[in-house]
Amino acid sequence: MTALNSYAFAMSEYAEGDSSLLQLQEVDSSRMGGHVLSPTFNSSSPSLPVESHPICIPSPYTDLGHDFTTLPFYSPSLLGYGTSPLSDCPSVRQSLSPTLFWPPHSHVSSLALHQQQTRLQPNHPTGGTWAELTPHDHGEEENCKPLSKRVAVAEETSTSLRGKADMHYCAVCSDYASGYHYGVWSCEGCKAFFKRSIQGHNDYICPATNQCTIDKNRRKSCQACRLRKCYEVGMMKCGLRRDRSSYQQRGAQQNRLTRFSGRMRTSGPRSQEIKTVQRPLSGNKVVTMALSPEELIARIMDAEPPEIYLMKDVKKPFTEANVMMSLTNLADKELVHMISWAKKIPGFVEIGLFDQVHLLECCWLEVLMLGLMWRSVNHPGKLVFSPDLSLSRDEGSCVQGFAEIFDMLLAATSRFRELKLQREEYACLKAMILLNSNMCLSSAEGGEELQSRSKLLCLLDSVTDALVWAISKTGLSFQQRSTRLAHLLMLLSHIRHVSNKGMDHLHSMKMKKMVPLYDLLLEMLDAHIMHGSRLSHSGPQADPVPKESNCVQETFTCTSQHGGTLRP
């Protein structure tokens, strides 16, 4: 390629036009061989005088070892020189355009062509002519595109539009939302702020009038108003994204039951004995179908946990702090034994894992309150929380807001005393509270959920039959047995109402940091609040407790006025 080392540039003019042609280098045709191509023009174009020697641009890639060719260069439009517009005649416009001569081999020379006024459009992918693109042929260009390319462009446009439509803004500060956090769309800043607030100290004070504007630029100016707005827009501690809630809840339930099972290892060989007996029968029927009501009651009574002692003296006079500390300490101890008790109920371990944990989370305070009433049934005017801790109404009133709950507990205990509750009846009622606690929240969708729910209903029917059998052993007539069963079931509704009151009180004490909460008690409290919030948002028919509790209160009033005439 020594013949390419010297470049001679000269300008000449066409005889029949004003355009200029840039001649680059005169190259010996014998040195170029088959790579030099003579220029050709469209048949419809007038012939133009051309030099007898080929004029070409030497390829800079010859030294790379590939068989590249040179590119003939004739059109003045490629060099950025102005030409007269010939848009009126497409054939003339095409004839004056340059022709791209493709080499006989598969390699194509790479040459970047930059222009300011004109663009080049390849009409044919395999060796057609290059035509100048003017605004008049833009529509023709779009029509000439393959259908696949036009569909791809349309999809990209629709995707970008959908991206803008799916864009969410933070409900607190109106910044761009990074996701669905704590129940609302929020940005990373507000999500982190709310997380810090619910996990640590949140006693913020507004320096103004508690009406500060919270937006993207002023969200850090007032923490109190920012936290207030977080609650106003619906942020909550247990808020979950709708499409992720099922998966995350199942994972959380699995972790909780794993921890519960770890606590169960301390229950001794009795758990293993129960497990060996509780083998499922055909279909969804569990082992309780093979047990008679008497045997089932005996098994449930054997599962009763031992008595729990506080093991320390509470200083008198009682104060709100030491009373609440003692009660929460006892509750945490009882929760550990409650898990063991539930596992020992025949058929309980045969239902689904999710339902097992859900049942315990929904009913734990009701079970504790029923046990409290059973211990206090022979101590009028007092509540026996443990053998070494009992409180009268005056002693319990030292806790703010506890007097109403205390009175409701005493009233229910008095009603059990009037009914002369038997131990067998108490054991069945306690098991029924456990098995009936999440009926309004259960949403069976898959095959495993349906099978678990079927087993749960079968177990509940068996316990109900056992309660009917226990009532029949009292020697009452059929009418009296039916009335007694109705009164006992109405008391379960009253216990649930008292439990909801107690849960709200315990939660308020937690928020005020008035009492230390133990790990298991705190976990069960948070889980119950989460289920309660789901229940309150599920519709007006989800919570019939207030109406039922009013009926129970009227029953209590009637009983007290007529000297216990409702006793069967």
From Swiss-Prot:
<dbReference type="GO" id="GO:0030520">
    <property type="term" value="P:estrogen receptor signaling pathway"/>
</dbReference>
<keyword id="KW-0238">DNA-binding</keyword>
<dbReference type="Pfam" id="PF00105">
    <property type="entry name" value="zf-C4"/>
</dbReference>
<comment type="subunit">
    <text>Binds DNA as a homodimer. Can form a heterodimer with ER-alpha.</text>
</comment>
<protein>
    <recommendedName>
        <fullName>Estrogen receptor beta-1</fullName>
    </recommendedName>
</protein>
<dbReference type="GO" id="GO:0008270">
    <property type="term" value="F:zinc ion binding"/>
</dbReference>
<dbReference type="InterPro" id="IPR001628">
    <property type="entry name" value="Znf_hrmn_rcpt"/>
</dbReference>
<keyword id="KW-0862">Zinc</keyword>
<dbReference type="InterPro" id="IPR001723">
    <property type="entry name" value="Nuclear_hrmn_rcpt"/>
</dbReference>
<keyword id="KW-0479">Metal-binding</keyword>
<dbReference type="InterPro" id="IPR021064">
    <property type="entry name" value="ER-beta-like_N"/>
</dbReference>
<keyword id="KW-0804">Transcription</keyword>
<dbReference type="InterPro" id="IPR050200">
    <property type="entry name" value="Nuclear_hormone_rcpt_NR3"/>
</dbReference>
<feature type="zinc finger region" description="NR C4-type">
    <location>
        <begin position="170"/>
        <end position="190"/>
    </location>
</feature>
<comment type="function">
    <text>Binds estrogens with an affinity similar to that of ER-alpha, and activates expression of reporter genes containing estrogen response elements (ERE) in an estrogen-dependent manner.</text>
</comment>
<dbReference type="GO" id="GO:0005634">
    <property type="term" value="C:nucleus"/>
</dbReference>
<dbReference type="InterPro" id="IPR035500">
    <property type="entry name" value="NHR-like_dom_sf"/>
</dbReference>
<dbReference type="InterPro" id="IPR000536">
    <property type="entry name" value="Nucl_hrmn_rcpt_lig-bd"/>
</dbReference>
<feature type="DNA-binding region" description="Nuclear receptor">
    <location>
        <begin position="170"/>
        <end position="235"/>
    </location>
</feature>
<dbReference type="GO" id="GO:0071392">
    <property type="term" value="P:cellular response to estradiol stimulus"/>
</dbReference>
<dbReference type="GO" id="GO:0043565">
    <property type="term" value="F:sequence-specific DNA binding"/>
</dbReference>
<keyword id="KW-0805">Transcription regulation</keyword>
<keyword id="KW-0446">Lipid-binding</keyword>
<dbReference type="InterPro" id="IPR028355">
    <property type="entry name" value="ER-beta/gamma"/>
</dbReference>
<feature type="region of interest" description="Modulating">
    <location>
        <begin position="12"/>
        <end position="169"/>
    </location>
</feature>
<keyword id="KW-0539">Nucleus</keyword>
<dbReference type="GO" id="GO:0005496">
    <property type="term" value="F:steroid binding"/>
</dbReference>
<dbReference type="InterPro" id="IPR024178">
    <property type="entry name" value="Est_rcpt/est-rel_rcp"/>
</dbReference>
<keyword id="KW-0754">Steroid-binding</keyword>
<dbReference type="Pfam" id="PF00104">
    <property type="entry name" value="Hormone_recep"/>
</dbReference>
<dbReference type="Pfam" id="PF12497">
    <property type="entry name" value="ERbeta_N"/>
</dbReference>
<dbReference type="InterPro" id="IPR013088">
    <property type="entry name" value="Znf_NHR/GATA"/>
</dbReference>
<keyword id="KW-0675">Receptor</keyword>
<keyword id="KW-0863">Zinc-finger</keyword>
<feature type="domain" description="NR LBD">
    <location>
        <begin position="292"/>
        <end position="528"/>
    </location>
</feature>
<comment type="similarity">
    <text>Belongs to the nuclear hormone receptor family. NR3 subfamily.</text>
</comment>
<dbReference type="GO" id="GO:0030284">
    <property type="term" value="F:nuclear estrogen receptor activity"/>
</dbReference>
<dbReference type="GO" id="GO:0042562">
    <property type="term" value="F:hormone binding"/>
</dbReference>
<feature type="zinc finger region" description="NR C4-type">
    <location>
        <begin position="206"/>
        <end position="230"/>
    </location>
</feature>
